[in-house]
A protein has these predicted regions:
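Anaerobic metallocofactor- and corrinoid-dependent redox/one-carbon enzyme cores
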Residues: 1-163
């Protein structure tokens, strides 16, 4: 659709800082560039969760404030029961969100015939937990144990739906 009803302007890469002052500075620069370019719409993604959710929401809010329509593309982590707030930060401007799936979903992984490496650290990995390894060699763990399983760039077919 580029050149017909949409014009792709480009990609803005920004970092996800640890300190609040750096987060503010980075998101200020993103919004300033969006305003300078006269962009009507923005897709904002993030990598990670928790602390990076603040960067996501700051970018959303500030791009909205300079007049851009914003759609967030992110994964969610609402806890094993699915009832917790799925993103660690929020802003009222975040009113259009595409979910790439939820990383806390517990998945059953059948036993493998051959294992390369060790299972010694599975229970300590993100997504693993004490007791996730079963006696028959299978495993029940959160989806996020598979690195990039819910990557917020949308390279998968996972989604979270609200009914």
């Amino acid at each position: 659709r580029h050149g017909k009803d949409l014009n792709f302007i480009g990609v803005i890469l920004t970092n996800e800082n640890v300190f609040l002052v750096d987060k503010e500075r980075s998101s200020d620069m993103v919004a300033k560039l969006i305003e300078f370019l006269g962009v009507d719409g923005v897709l904002v993604t993030e990598e990670g969760y928790g602390n990076p959710d603040t960067d996501l929401m700051m970018n959303c809010r500030k791009c909205s404030e300079v007049g851009a329509n914003v759609v967030l593309i992110t994964d969610e982590f609402p806890g094993k029961d699915g009832k917790s707030q799925s993103i660690a930060d929020a802003t009222k401007e975040a009113d259009a969100v595409v979910s790439c799936g939820q990383g806390n979903l517990v998945v059953h992984f059948p036993a493998m015939e051959k294992i390369i490496g060790t299972l010694d650290y599975v229970e300590m990995m993100i997504g693993g937990y004490k007791g996730c390894l079963n006696e028959d060699g299978s495993m029940d763990a959160e989806l996020q144990i598979i690195i990039a399983s819910t990557i917020a760039n949308g390279y998968n077919h996972l989604t979270a739906r609200y009914y």
